A protein has these predicted regions:
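Alpha-helical support elements that line or immediately flank enzyme active sites
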Residues: 65-66, 152-160, 237-244, 249, ...
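Active-site rim segments in enzyme catalytic domains, especially the processed small/beta chain
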Residues: 85-110, 261-263, 403-471, 501, ...
Length: 580
């Protein structure tokens, strides 16, 4: 749901941004305005700690944990569990995602808790009798669910990098589920718009989110007694309760009764994985993001590397020339995504080649500022030898400078719409993120290849891109977004707006966005760009499509004195950045 003031705000942002795109070969990046003087858009400010999330109640849970002495990881896990209660559209126990952690001493690590295909999954399981993808199977059936990873990921993070016990950080979520909370605008709207398509088809789901034959409305109280019991068991017995105990039994029985594939053995075998983040240097800043099976980190760094080959400062924010260069760079990156990206435990992902600056230069040499290249003429690049809206994001920074960026999901809104037995837990439809048939797009229009084909115990490719930017050796920007295929370009523009433009975090958040993903061959834009600019882009050969808002960033910027500046996205309602 888009805030009524959003379009007016992005229009102002576009006018105020001025000339701000720049590249490494250009003069130094402009100094950052942290939003304390003449800027129109002002971030939230705090001294000790800050949380930015899509839900105000969950944000407050995180702030309370920080106030009680918890670190950023403690708060991040508490927020994640709270969102599973208050933002069931995407917050979850039955899904998965990624967490990026940067400690106060500068160590940065990535935790992969992406869902896994069950052991009985087969390559062609989502094809019909004619050999074509069947979206009902991959989106709304019990076959659509991968083995969930959220509980394992949160436990790995808490055990290794947190300071509080599990029962402490789960307690706020348990109370919210047991006692209930007031349904806000965002949840009411999504229940009506998206929930109506999947939730009423399943009695367990309908019993939770429906009242007298209608979806819950704003102002109603949502009590989730069964979810409270599951949270209580996890708090008392740890992740084994989810993967080997009563909850595992409920999930396995739900699958067995309804033709799903997840078994108790799949759940018992699931492990979250700690990985080395993807990193790159851009104009004196270090950018850290998720490695595969996320494609986000690789392609954010790849596109930034391409942009370094252009002196973009003279073009200005939102100009046709600047947008042309970025859109063309995005086409090449998404073409590579379709060919090379997959689960690194199963396929060799050429991440070093894709993030190589020489490779970026070879792409930049093919970009014509005056003429768009049709997507049909763009093919995945020839690489050097191997060396390898329905989501939610939140960011946390604590008083010591520890930072956490988390993006996790059920895939589409409310996932399959299936609640597993009496667990109160909604299940994901993440299997749709595999390439059911190479060359055929998924629900987000993304095209994949053999590297992302369905396979047993494999993790599907993702666009989720929790990102941390470092300046002068210190955490500077913590950001991320939902948005399916548009996550990568949304996060990219937050980084570019902040570094190249000197925008404060609120300005960078409010600025209008655009997106090109190679296929379909269209340049998707939000309202807020000049009509003349869009006409110029069309004259260059871009197929401009004016569509709804993109992304919902939740970001925190750290000033040179350690003061925190945060912003929640005006494209969402009921989100909140808060600190103390």
């Amino acid at each position: 749901m888009i805030k009524p003031t959003f379009l007016r705000r992005v229009a102002i942002a576009a006018l105020l941004s001025g000339s701000c795109f720049s590249a490494a070969a250009a003069p130094p990046a402009p100094p950052v305005s942290y939003g304390v003087e003449e800027d129109v858009f002002h971030p939230v400010r705090a001294k000790q700690g800050m949380v930015a999330s899509v839900d105000a109640t969950a944000t407050q849970v995180g702030v309370d944990i920080l106030k009680e002495g918890g670190n950023a990881v403690d708060a991040a896990v508490a927020v994640g569990y709270a969102l599973a209660v208050t933002h069931p559209q995407a917050g979850n126990l039955g899904g998965g995602g990624f967490m990026l952690i940067r400690s106060k001493n500068g160590n940065t690590t990535a935790i992969d808790f992406r869902e896994m295909a069950p052991a009985k999954a087969t390559r062609d399981m989502f094809l019909d009798d004619q050999g074509n993808p069947d979206s009902k199977k991959s989106l709304t059936s019990h076959l659509a669910s991968g083995t969930p990873g959220t509980v394992a990921g949160f436990s790995l993070a808490l055990d290794k990098y947190g300071t509080m016990p599990l029962n402490k950080v789960v307690q706020p979520a348990f109370k919210l589920a047991r006692d209930g909370f007031i349904v806000n605008d965002a949840l009411a709207d999504d229940l009506k718009t998206y929930g109506s398509e999947v939730l009423p088809n399943h009695e367990n789901s309908k019993a939770i989110f429906w009242k007298e034959g209608e979806p819950l409305k704003k102002g109603d109280t949502l009590v989730q007694a069964n979810l409270a019991k599951s949270l209580e068991m996890i708090a008392e017995n740890g992740p084994d309760e989810f993967y080997k105990g009563t909850i595992a039994e409920q999930i396995a029985q739900e699958m067995q009764k309804n033709g799903g594939l997840i078994t108790k053995e799949d759940l018992a075998a699931y492990k979250a994985v700690e990985r080395t983040p993807i990193s790159g240097d851009y104009r004196g800043y270090q950018v850290y993001s998720m490695p595969p099976p996320s494609s986000g980190g690789i392609h954010i760094v790849q596109i930034l590397n391409i942009l370094e080959n252009f002196d973009m400062k003279k073009y200005g924010f939102g100009s046709a020339d600047a947008m042309q260069i970025m859109a063309e760079a995005e086409k090449y990156a998404y073409a590579d995504r379709s060919e090379y990206l997959g689960d690194p435990d199963f396929v060799k992902v050429p991440w070093q080649a894709l993030t190589n600056k020489a490779y970026a230069k070879s792409i930049a040499d093919q970009i014509d500022i005056n003429k768009a290249k049709p997507s049909s003429e763009i093919r995945p690049g020839k690489l050097a030898p191997y060396e390898s809206n329905q989501t939610t994001h939140y960011s946390v920074v604590d008083k010591d400078g520890n930072a956490v960026a988390v993006t996790y999901t059920l895939n589409t809104t409310f996932g399959t719409g299936i609640v597993a037995g009496e667990s109160g837990i909604l299940l994901n439809n993440q299997m749709d993120d595999f390439s059911a048939k190479p060359g055929v797009p998924n629900v987000y229009g993304l095209v994949g290849g053999d590297a992302n084909a369905v396979g047993p115990n494999k993790r599907p490719l993702s666009s989720m891109s929790p990102t941390i930017v470092v300046k002068d050796g210190k955490t500077w920007l913590v950001t991320g977004s939902p948005g399916g295929s548009r996550i990568i370009t949304t996060v990219l523009q937050m980084v570019v707006n902040s570094i190249n433009c000197g925008m404060n975090v609120a300005e960078a958040t409010n600025a209008p966005r655009f997106h090109h993903q190679w296929l379909p061959d269209e340049l998707r834009v939000e309202k807020g760009f000049s009509p003349d600019t869009l006409k110029l882009l069309e004259a260059k050969g871009q197929k401009v499509a004016l569509k709804e808002a993109m992304g919902s960033t939740q970001s925190i910027m750290v000033g040179p004195d350690g003061e925190l500046y945060g912003a929640s996205d005006p494209r969402s309602v009921d989100d909140l950045t808060a600190g103390y």
